[in-house]
């Protein structure tokens, strides 16, 4: 899979002028189970798919302040799926998607995998992406927070790498319907590292992921979070939608509660799963292709050991061997701890994504 970049602006808005048979190609490749799930959970109806898409497209004229750089059927469809085919909500998300990019132009300049900042973040494992999906068909993303080397990667570049990864993944219509899971392992994440997570950059991430991207997140799982991450979470809660807050789960070092929501057979051994330890270079190799092996010397003796030699266009430097920190989670008896004390600990919100 090659690097992804923002598409050039369309000269003219697309209009639908085909028949139903032409439109149903948008569901091509979906399993019968996923098509039925889209019908039941997302209100997706192939008989009126063209009408739903066109209704969203017709709203573009109401926001002349925004440059809608892409308006084809497949692109608009992912926003409809993200908002359960409520056309007004889908258009609002579409507008926020492009407005976020207008307001943060520097973030999306050279927005592709071989951009030096994005490339470094990908090589350092931001994000990790598991090859297989969970039992609900959701893609699992991993963030090992302690591996953030602040001398190598800015928070913004890590965010750019995550957004670019989501752009690549969301091309899969199965994931548009089934969604994503994010697991953040805070093992060995120091107070000094946490001090760099200012409210302004956290707000930037929330706006980019929660408010401006057409992905369905079924859950955000914190593992091994220290007390100061709880404090940071308190700071960002006002920026989170109620739906988002209900889907954030704080597991501490008790993996049994995580396994209640994500079965161990879909998790690497770092999280008490039955899969092998996660290879931090897997996703970077997928996005960078030949560029990965040409410019970087990776030696994986295990998840713990990663040696990186990086050469940039402006500066040659050799990084000292970097120890990738392992999760300190344990599997022990316990129950799920939701972020809201006293709140019903029903897992249903994770099954019926909004």
Swiss-Prot record:
SMART domains: CRAL_TRIO_N, SEC14. It is found in: Golgi apparatus, trans-Golgi network membrane; Early endosome membrane; Cytoplasmic vesicle, Clathrin-coated vesicle. Transmembrane segments: none annotated. Residues 345-354 have a biased composition (Polar residues). It comes from the Eukaryota. Keywords: Cytoplasmic vesicle, Endosome, Golgi apparatus, Lipid-binding, Membrane. GO terms for molecular function: phosphatidylinositol-3,5-bisphosphate binding. Residues 333-354 are annotated as: Disordered. InterPro entries: CRAL-TRIO_dom (IPR001251), CRAL-TRIO_dom_sf (IPR036865), CRAL/TRIO_N_dom (IPR011074), CRAL/TRIO_N_dom_sf (IPR036273). It is a peripheral membrane protein. GO terms for cellular component: clathrin-coated vesicle; early endosome membrane; endosome; trans-Golgi network. Residues 118-279 form the CRAL-TRIO domain. Its main location: Golgi. Residues 335-344 have a biased composition (Basic and acidic residues). Gene3D superfamilies: Alpha-tocopherol transfer, CRAL-TRIO lipid binding domain, N-terminal domain of phosphatidylinositol transfer protein sec14p. One of its GO terms (biological process) is lysosome organization. PROSITE patterns: CRAL_TRIO. SUPFAM superfamilies: CRAL/TRIO domain, CRAL/TRIO N-terminal domain. Required for normal morphology of late endosomes and/or lysosomes in neurons. Binds phosphatidylinositol 3,5-bisphosphate (PtdIns(3,5)P2). Forms a complex with clathrin heavy chain and gamma-adaptin. The CRAL-TRIO domain is required for targeting to the membrane and for binding PtdIns(3,5)P2. Binding to PtdIns(3,5)P2 is not required for localization. This is Clavesin-1. The lineage of its organism: Eukaryota, Metazoa, Chordata, Craniata, Vertebrata.
């Amino acid at each position: 899979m090659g690097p992804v970049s923002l598409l050039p602006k369309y000269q003219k808005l697309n209009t639908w002028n085909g028949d139903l048979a032409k439109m149903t190609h948008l569901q091509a490749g979906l399993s019968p189970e996923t098509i039925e799930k889209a019908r039941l959970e997302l209100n997706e109806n192939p008989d009126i798919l063209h009408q739903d898409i066109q209704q969203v497209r017709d709203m573009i004229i109401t926001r002349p302040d925004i440059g809608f750089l892409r308006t084809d059927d497949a692109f608009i469809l992912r926003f409809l799926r993200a908002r359960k085919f409520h056309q007004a909500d889908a258009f609002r998300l579409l507008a926020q998607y492009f407005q976020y990019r207008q307001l943060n132009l520097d973030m999306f300049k050279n927005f592709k995998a071989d951009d030096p900042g994005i490339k470094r973040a990908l090589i350092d494992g931001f994000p990790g992406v598991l090859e297989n999906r969970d039992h609900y068909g959701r893609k699992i993303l991993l963030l090992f927070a302690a591996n953030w080397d602040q001398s190598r990667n800015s928070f913004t570049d890590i965010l750019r790498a995550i957004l670019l990864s989501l752009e690549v993944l969301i091309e899969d219509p199965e994931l548009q319907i089934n969604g994503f899971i994010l697991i953040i392992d805070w093992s060995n994440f120091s107070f000094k590292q946490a001090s760099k997570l200012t409210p302004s950059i956290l707000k930037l991430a929330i706006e980019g992921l929660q408010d401006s991207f057409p992905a369905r997140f079924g859950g955000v799982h914190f593992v091994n979070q220290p007390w100061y991450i709880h404090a940071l979470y308190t700071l960002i809660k006002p920026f989170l939608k109620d739906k988002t807050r209900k889907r954030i789960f704080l597991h501490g070092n008790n993996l049994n509660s995580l396994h209640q929501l994500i079965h161990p057979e879909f998790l690497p051994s770092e999280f008490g799963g039955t899969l092998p330890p996660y290879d931090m270079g897997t996703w970077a190799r997928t996005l960078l292709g030949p560029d990965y092996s040409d410019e970087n010397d990776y030696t994986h003796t295990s998840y713990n050991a990663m040696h990186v030699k990086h050469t940039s266009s402006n500066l040659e430097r050799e990084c000292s061997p970097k120890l990738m920190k392992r999760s300190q989670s344990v599997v022990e008896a316990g129950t799920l701890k939701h972020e809201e004390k006293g709140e019903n600990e029903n897992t249903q919100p994770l099954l019926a994504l909004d």
